[in-house]
């Protein structure tokens, strides 16, 4: 399972929404954050980051079973992803077709997300491809009233997944270019 919500009753728009949210958040967790901590602290930084991130994935829940000891891993994960989430968001905005609009929407909406970090890349992806993400959903049998990110966007469809993947592809090329540029500069 790649999403935390109940997927039994999702329609195609809900599935597209969940996939785009996962793509956006996992760009930060799986690409930007390991690179950030690797550049900052070397291989030990990557190992520490992945340990914290994995612990959060396994036990960082607010349910009865994990509440008493999972909160620490969740808060630590929030801390180590604070800068990488915003870097990811900024990079998505820079490679979008309308950078200023994406930045404006991101600064307006990102903090409305229930996560202190996930809202940043999710809002930037939503604004970049013109869809709305987050919003009400069902977690563990309870309907949430989460606000929409990029509320003026349309409901995502299957074709928006291709737009999201194209955006992610441009993101990877931009990161590769920046890493090569930094490597060249460090040798000068």
Question: Model-predicted segments: where are they?
Answer:
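Hydrophobic alpha-helical transmembrane segments
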Residues: 1-48, 52, 60-188
